[in-house]
Amino acid sequence: MSAFTPKYPISDEAMLDLLNKYPFLKFRKAYGSREPAYETDAENIENNYYKYWDGNGWEDLWKNRYIPRLFKLYDSWDDETKAKFEFMDVKEKYGELRIYTSVSTGEDSLNEIACDLSSWICADCGAEPREEGHRVIWTTGGWITNLCEECARKAIEKGVRTSFDDQLDAMKNVKTKPFGYTVYRLGQETKVIFKETEDGWLERDHVEQINKNNQTT
């Protein structure tokens, strides 16, 4: 959990309300345990999943896009499903935001969408650069981190990378294909294509079926 100053702070009173309404925001001593890691309200207000990415480039993605949709989905569940739900793990891996939960987010694909979007968001400042309408990002080698051009230049200047312009060009990635995923089953491909919403999330746009003869329907 980041100790940096949040871009989107929340009052202690509002945080406590969220913790009471959405208990999965509290840290647990161990996965599957109903015992909280912290005993007092003050400790839980300071240390919780809502504030997990405070000060990180993914804070907006986490607080303003992923979490509100998770709240809405959680509110739609029955009490039994709510009781089962918790975060199993939330972390950065290979430059992406990985979210593992005890209950699937189903067709909403919240965890997967957050992961896909995170790889095109600067992990340092939160910028989402585009060129000619396409998302673009600069990826470091070694410990993989996805950065905007400005933050990538700063990383190179700090000595994280040995060269400059050539290295910057080598780090650059441009997203030319839409977000989505493919399911393979019984010789047929099903492509689910997403479109971006006004608030920077993804939702299903259309589905393409590709049969054995490579024909799209």
What are these regions (language model features)?
Residues 122-125, 148:
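Short cysteine-rich clusters marking metal-coordination/redox-active sites
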